[in-house]
């Protein structure tokens, strides 16, 4: 590989320098996106998260750039299931002792009932006589003559309209 042109001297004060490789969304020198006169006008290698608009899009916020294998160890308390803090039980007032009960009297078995006296036998029931045909109903009072019913309208499935 022959170099056709010598590499340009890269100094700490050169704001136009890109890192090796194709410039991507986050490969700009520090302060490129900062407005003029912004206090973050620092020259040097680009740092993700330094006022970099692309840092949020690329998934690298720049907060944890220590190393890929760095994991934040959890304290041992975080592994245990959380316990709800219980309020200490308030001791109840001591119960007032009751006076002792009188001892129960033992149950005395009841005297056996006297045997039932048989009832006097009745005559067997006479079979019912067939009903006599009733006389036709008497008409209602004369002041209220019966009027024939008017037929109702047939109901529809939708209900009354």
From Swiss-Prot:
Residues 85-156 are annotated as: 12 X 6 AA approximate tandem repeats. Residues 90-161 have a biased composition (Basic and acidic residues). Residues 1-12 have a biased composition (Pro residues). It is found in: Host nucleus, Host nucleolus; Host cytoplasm. May be phosphorylated on Ser residues by host kinases. GO terms for biological process: symbiont-mediated perturbation of host cell cycle progression; symbiont-mediated perturbation of host transcription; symbiont-mediated suppression of host autophagy; symbiont-mediated suppression of host cytoplasmic pattern recognition receptor signaling pathway via inhibition of MDA-5 activity; symbiont-mediated suppression of host cytoplasmic pattern recognition receptor signaling pathway via inhibition of RIG-I activity; symbiont-mediated suppression of host cytoplasmic pattern recognition receptor signaling pathway via inhibition of TBK1 activity; symbiont-mediated suppression of host PKR/eIFalpha signaling; symbiont-mediated suppression of host toll-like receptor signaling pathway. Residues 1-161 are annotated as: Disordered. GO terms for cellular component: host cell cytoplasm; host cell nucleolus; host cell nucleus. Its main location: host cell. Belongs to the simplex virus US11 protein family. Associates with RNA derived from the 60S ribosomal subunits. Seems to form large heterogeneous polymers of up to 200 identical subunits in the cytoplasm. Interacts with host EIF2AK2. Interacts with host NCL. Interacts with host RIGI; this interaction prevents RIGI binding to host MAVS. Interacts with host IFIH1; this interaction prevents host IFH1 binding to MAVS. Interacts with host HSP90; this interaction inhibits TBK1-induced interferon induction. The N-terminal tetrapeptide may be responsible for virion incorporation. This is Accessory factor US11. It comes from Human herpesvirus 1 (strain 17) (HHV-1). The lineage of its organism: Viruses, Duplodnaviria, Heunggongvirae, Peploviricota, Herviviricetes.
């Amino acid at each position: 590989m022959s170099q056709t042109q010598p590499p340009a001297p890269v100094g700490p004060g050169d704001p136009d320098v890109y890192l090796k490789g194709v410039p991507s969304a986050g490969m700009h020198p520090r302060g490129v996106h900062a407005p003029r006169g912004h206090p973050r006008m620092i020259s040097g290698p680009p740092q993700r998260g330094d006022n970099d608009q692309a840092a949020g899009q690329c998934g690298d916020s720049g907060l944890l750039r220590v190393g890929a294998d760095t994991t934040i160890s959890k304290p041992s308390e975080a592994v245990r299931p959380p316990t709800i803090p219980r309020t200490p039980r308030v001791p109840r007032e001591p119960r007032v002792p009751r006076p002792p009960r009188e001892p129960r009297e033992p149950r005395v078995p009841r005297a056996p009932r006297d045997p039932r006296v048989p009832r006097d036998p009745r005559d067997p029931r006479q079979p019912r006589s067939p009903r006599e045909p009733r006389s036709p109903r008497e008409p209602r009072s004369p002041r209220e003559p019966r009027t024939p019913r008017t037929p109702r309208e047939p109901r529809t499935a939708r209900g009354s309209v």
